[in-house]
From Swiss-Prot:
Extent of Low complexity compositional bias: 159-171
Stored InterPro entries: Cold_shock_domain, CSD, CSD_CS, CSP_DNA-bd, NA-bd_OB-fold
A Gene Ontology molecular function term of the record: RNA binding
Regions of compositional bias (Acidic residues) in chain numbering: 10-20
Record has Aminoacyl-tRNA synthetase as a keyword: no
Stored PROSITE patterns: CSD_1, CSD_2
Post-translational modification: Phosphorylation activates in vitro RNA binding.
UniProt function note: Binds RNA in vitro.
Keywords of the record: Nucleus, Phosphoprotein, RNA-binding, Transcription, Transcription regulation
Gene3D superfamilies per UniProt: Nucleic acid-binding proteins
A GO term from the CC aspect: nucleus
Protein name: Y-box factor homolog
Amino acid sequence: MADTEKQPEVEENQPDQEQNEEQKEKKIIASQVSGTVKWFNVKSGYGFINRDDTKEDVFVHQTAIVKNNPRKYLRSVGDGEKVEFDVVEGEKGNEAANVTGPEGSNVQGSKYAADRRRFRRGGWYPRFRGGGRGGRPRQDMDDGAPDFMPSPRGRGRGRPYYQNRRYFGPPRRGGGRQYLEGEGEYQLQRDQGFRGARRPFYRPLLRTTSQGLLRRWLLRLPRRTTQGRTSQARRRERPWGLPQRQRPKPRQR
């Protein structure tokens, strides 16, 4: 019989001892203590609160804030803000826990803390022609919307609707786009006396061929007459009328 091979046992990575150890519950010294924030650093995430009863400065960390301002991205308390908290015994002294606003409300937060971004969830944007991409209409839209609003099709968001998105020129006087119910399109309606934007002038491109360059060069040259010239001078000229290049005379020493 063949010897059975022993498979090595896979040792699982054990978590750190610090994570396995249960965190000891901190001893509560006082509860629902009111105080004023002395200072708080948003970047570092900690600060100090001055108790109203004993005038003692208590350390506070951002993780101790229970009810944060929902508009703020990070947990924080503002300088000079009135808060309520519990005093617990920490490793290096007294600390604040369960920090809330007055009477258990949300804290205002620091003015240096970043606000949350406001995303538009759902909804659709009407387009110029047709519905295109879009979702369900919003509930906060007025019921008295015009009948020619494009109906949404598909999923996702559509492009924003601009009435005069392709117009470049002076401001209009009473002009706009008029919807044609029969054709389902928009027609540009202009006021009387409005001429519209001026059409741009495009200069034609010049030819870069040798024939075009030669023609341009000949047009710039003055007209030459052959009267009074000898045959020897005529031979020096090129067949198309350009003079032969003259070499510079050597300097006399």
